[in-house]
Swiss-Prot record:
Substrate binds at residues 11, 43, 75, 89. The lineage of its organism: Bacteria, Pseudomonadati, Thermodesulfobacteriota, Desulfuromonadia, Geobacterales. This is Phosphopantetheine adenylyltransferase. GO terms for biological process: coenzyme A biosynthetic process. GO terms for cellular component: cytoplasm. It comes from Geobacter sulfurreducens (strain ATCC 51573 / DSM 12127 / PCA). One of its GO terms (molecular function) is pantetheine-phosphate adenylyltransferase activity. Pathway: Cofactor biosynthesis; coenzyme A biosynthesis; CoA from (R)-pantothenate: step 4/5. Belongs to the bacterial CoaD family. InterPro entries: Cyt_trans-like, PPAT, Rossmann-like_a/b/a_fold. It comes from the Bacteria. Its EC number is 2.7.7.3. Keywords: ATP-binding, Coenzyme A biosynthesis, Cytoplasm, Magnesium, Nucleotide-binding, Nucleotidyltransferase, Transferase.
Amino acid sequence: MPTKIAVYPGSFDPITYGHLDIIDRALRIFDQVIVAVARNSAKSALFTTDERVDMIQRVLADNVRARVDTFDGLLIDYVLSQKATVIIRGLRAISDFEYEFQIAQMNRSISQDVETLFMMTSVPYGYLSSSIVKEVSSLNGPIDGLVPPLVRQALRDKFAGPDR
């Protein structure tokens, strides 16, 4: 039986428990999930690509069916190069859906061999985003329930200034 491979793309700047929830749930459906970190994201990143990959690899170290990789260029080209058939996208709100729907339609127009699977975030993570985590952390707020401990420490290190 062929291996069912899905790609979960994103900037993951940084990875949160919301992302990890989607990965865990996707692994219930697929044999392998590739967490694909965007190298040339339009977003301005706090962490370098290498730092993001390292954090994700460390967080997922015990899961042999999750693999971390990077990509640039068109996502659909990367997905096809990995012999994956599904793109996983997490949705928090209807506003996420409108944008993601447009991207999914564009990907579908390029290749009908790849489907996009939208997964609603679990209730505790419905509001969670990397941007919120970075903002709260930059203001020295509590992020314990939002990111794994090693990510929390990396954020503290990034935001530690001479006056902290």
